[in-house]
């Protein structure tokens, strides 16, 4: 699973969904998702990340679906910050 970035309609806020792997086990199983959120001040600069939290996979999927329904769109612009 790779990292997904969503941006709102006004292009002022972003949320980044990335897998959180359990490093204590030998198998690289994904059991949670790290959701980071931040603000975009200029399109040409890096976003300012305000915080992050860890959610279960189901809770993260539900939030992802709700954001898409609210008009957020997937973007690749900020994947390398």
Language-model features and meaning:
Residues 1-66, 75-81:
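Terminus-proximal functional modules
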